[in-house]
A protein has these predicted regions:
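N-terminal beta1-alpha1-beta2 module of alpha/beta enzyme domains
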Residues: 2-75, 136, 179, 279-282
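Glycine-enriched alpha-helix->loop->beta-strand junction motifs that scaffold or abut catalytic
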Residues: 75-78, 107, 196-201, 256-260
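Short, acidic/polar
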Residues: 30-42, 99, 184-193, 243-253
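Conserved, mostly hydrophobic/aromatic
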Residues: 46, 72, 103, 146, ...
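Flexible, glycine-rich active-site loops centered on histidine and acidic residues
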Residues: 13-31, 89-156
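C-terminal helical cap(s) of enzyme catalytic domains, especially alpha/beta-barrels
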Residues: 142-147, 213-220, 269-285
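N-terminal small/glycine-rich loop or linker at the start of catalytic domains
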Residues: 8-27, 118-124, 160-178, 229-235
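Hydrophobic faces of well-ordered beta-strands that scaffold small-molecule active sites
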Residues: 19-23, 50-52, 81-83, 111-115, ...
Length: 285
């Protein structure tokens, strides 16, 4: 299946599921080296992408997803790379635009920007007590700025949260018409936000392996996304777990509308050697 220049399916293509690995950057994966090892194994085993969490305050030591993805970009040729998901209000938009542009360039146009509001459990311990409404407004305003800057625009902007005067902070991105943006979040406002962009990314399970989004839940959300104007080629990415050699629930999520399945890889699931073995066994096709 071929993609357009921004990694999205063309409207005339039949939908097909792609498979990636979701890296949780704690424990052994707080360091870039083991993640690069996973990425190389994933590419060799036929996986299509790699996404990585962007949190600051979970389970002790936390890796930097942007630095790690840069290392993965330089070590792979084919994997699509995704932030899962970056809390936009935690970043200054002009610095975020430079990071998005850098990963787009390093990867040769293989980067997708996964974005969201962030969660209180992650932000509050670092002194960020802004409510969801404020962070939503900041996210919407910042995303527009990031995309404009990644299209090499000189930006004049005076908004509720950000100001820019004749500011050009990045060269034009490799991907057209823009670096694709996927939105994370469960709420109806998050889904409406996602429908304005290029995709939605969600989790089938939580860190305890409990199901938090069933195939039926996903199907309902996909119906809502379409009603909100999600265009042809819109991606729906789901994170979950399967056993090597078995497809598990992945086909049910595909039937419900998923276009990506990301296999969760993290220290609570097993050792690095066990995760390498699972990744090397290939995707649940």
């Amino acid at each position: 299946m071929e993609d357009d220049a921004a990694g999205r399916r063309r409207p005339d293509e039949e939908a097909a599921v792609r498979y990636g690995i979701e890296v949780v950057p704690f424990g052994p994966y707080a360091e870039p080296g083991p993640v690069v090892e996973l990425a190389r194994a994933a590419e060799a085993a036929g996986w299509d992408g790699l996404c990585i969490w962007d949190h600051c305050h979970f389970w002790g030591g936390v890796g930097d997803p942007w630095v790690t993805l840069a290392a993965v970009a330089c070590a792979t040729d084919r994997l699509r790379l995704v932030t899962d998901v970056s809390p936009v209000p935690r970043y200054r938009p002009h610095l975020l635009a430079r990071s998005v542009h850098a990963l787009d360039a390093l990867s040769g146009g293989r980067f997708t920007f996964g974005a969201g509001l962030g969660v209180a459990e992650d932000l509050a311990p670092l002194g960020d007590h802004r409510d969801d409404r404020t962070r939503a407004a900041m996210t919407d305003e910042a995303l527009e700025l990031v995309v404009r800057w990644c299209n090499a625009e000189t930006v004049d902007h005076e908004g509720e949260h950000y100001v820019a005067t004749a500011a050009q902070v990045a060269n034009r991105a490799t991907q057209t018409p823009r670096v694709p943006v996927w939105i994370g979040g469960w709420s109806r406002p998050a889904l409406r936000r996602a429908a304005r962009w290029d995709g939605w990314i969600t989790s089938a399970i939580d860190e305890t392996q409990s199901v938090v989004c069933s195939p039926e839940d996903l199907a309902g959300s996909v119906t809502y996304l379409r009603a909100q104007g999600a265009r042809e080629g819109f991606d729906v990415a789901v994170n979950g777990t399967t056993t090597a050699g078995e497809r598990g629930l992945a086909p049910a999520y595909a039937e419900a509308g998923a276009t990506w399945w990301f296999e969760s890889v993290f220290g609570l699931r097993g050792s690095h050697e066990q995760m390498l073995e699972r990744v090397s066994a290939g995707p649940p096709r």
